[in-house]
Swiss-Prot record:
Tissue expression profile of the protein: Expressed in stems, leaves, flowers and seeds.
Comp. bias intervals (Low complexity): 1-17
Xref: SUPFAM superfamilies: F-box domain, Tubby C-terminal domain-like
Protein name in UniProt: Tubby-like F-box protein 2
UniProt region (Disordered), positions on chain: 1-44
Protein family (similarity comment): Belongs to the TUB family.
Pfam families named in the record: Tub (PF01167)
Organism: Oryza sativa subsp. japonica
InterPro entries assigned to the protein according to its UniProt record, in alphabetical order: F-box-like_dom_sf (IPR036047), Tubby-like_C (IPR025659), Tubby_C (IPR000007)
Annotated ranges, domain F-box: 49-104
N-terminal signal peptide: none
UniProt cross-references to Gene3D superfamilies, sorted A to Z: 1.20.1280.50, Tubby Protein, Chain A
Length: 368
């Protein structure tokens, strides 16, 4: 048996002592930069290519089946998930899904700025938090009207000098001015009798893609709004004050810019289709309530959607066509059903964004 011997320092065998670390070096290890893609990136690219390589007719049939089986939320988030697969799937989903004007459904974030349904009003409700001066708009899916309903928009009220301002956002966690999820605002005058609705993300040609840092997708936890491309006035709300009837119902008038949209749903990343729509100005006036002698109060027919008498309850009507009943011209109604819960029903030509902004102007004390 050969005895073990200590190797000399001049031996070619490696020493058992660890090599001394060079002085003043960075201990962090950097990956070797290579011109070739990593295997993981290659697999992701190949997977996306396989999804986009489906036959367009077959893909359209698949999305039609998914859309037909997802009539209401939350199952309708499957349609949004399909549109998020790749560009090809998004284009087909936009062609398959009808806008709220035709389908009566809200699917994509762009639906919030499209005209409401033509046949029946879109039933929503607003929850108010007096402590934080915040307001949340939900799509009414059940009669309970809880926070589990489909979230649409949120707003926060703050005072800037002598004016009050509401920041409207599509992210319930981004309720502050300057947030990337803000889509517009509502600003009042000193007396609170005149409000201006501004759209920070007007849908016109040149609107860019979503920002990945801007909140949540519509229907799950990955919603991203359009990149802000401007500041456009899209409406104005005025409250009239009468010296002869200081304790009468509020009288309000609203002038809004209503885009005329036809066809399929608008791709949130494509502003060209919205650029073809021609905005038209429309003046809406509050419906005059009737005096009820037995109840000794002013009354309006809300068709069971309002439960509590309040000075905030109102109905906005469009100009009446010859021979058309006045009940069919109500395009927006707002009413109180609890201390901090209000219903909001809107229809064509208003969008959810415009209707929400008009209802926000009704909160607070004003000389009207």
């Amino acid at each position: 048996m050969v005895p073990w011997r200590r190797s000399s320092s001049s031996s070619s065998a490696p020493s058992s002592r660890p090599a001394r670390r060079p002085a003043r070096t960075n201990a962090r290890v950097s990956p070797d930069v290579s011109s070739e893609l990593s295997p993981l990136a290659g697999e992701e690219g190949a997977g996306e290519e396989r999804w986009s390589a489906l036959v367009p007719d077959l893909l359209a049939d698949i999305l039609r089946c998914v859309e037909a089986g997802s009539e209401r939320w939350p199952p309708r988030r499957d349609v949004v998930a399909c549109a998020s697969v790749c560009r090809r799937w998004r284009d087909v989903a936009v062609a398959v899904v009808q806008p709220p004007l035709e389908s009566g459904k809200i699917t994509f974030p762009s639906s919030l700025k499209q005209p409401g349904p033509r046949d029946a009003p879109m039933q929503c409700f607003i929850k108010r938090n007096k402590k934080n001066s915040t307001f949340f708009l939900y799509l009414g899916l059940t009669q309970e009207l809880t926070d589990d309903e489909k979230f649409l928009l949120a707003a926060r009220r703050c005072r800037r000098g002598l004016h009050k301002e509401y920041a409207i956002t599509i992210n319930s966690d981004g309720l502050f001015h300057g947030s990337q999820s803000c889509v517009g605002n509502l600003k009042s005058n000193f007396t609170g009798t005149k409000f201006t609705i501004r759209d920070w993300q007007p849908p016109y040609e040149g609107a860019k893609a979503f920002s990945s840092r801007s909140g949540r997708w519509f229907g799950n936890k990955h919603r991203c709004p359009l990149v802000s491309t401007g500041d456009v006035e899209v409406g104005e709300v005025s409250y009239k004050y009468s010296l002869l009837r200081p304790r009468g119902p509020r009288r309000m008038s609203c002038s809004v810019q209503c885009p005329v949209l036809k066809g399929t749903a608008v791709d949130p990343q494509d502003g060209k289709r919205l650029s073809n729509s021609i905005p038209s100005s429309l003046v809406l006036n509050s419906k005059v309530p009737s005096w009820h002698e037995h109840l000794q109060c002013w009354c309006l027919n809300f068709h069971g959607r309002v439960m509590v008498a309040s000075v905030k309850n109102f109905q906005l009507i469009a100009p009446v066509e010859p021979g058309e009943p006045s009940d069919k011209t109500v395009v927006l109604q707002f009413g109180k059903i609890d201390d901090d819960v209000f219903t909001m029903d809107y229809r064509q030509p208003l969008s959810a964004f415009q209707a929400f902004a008009i209802c926000l102007s009704n909160f607070g004390t004003k000389l009207a």
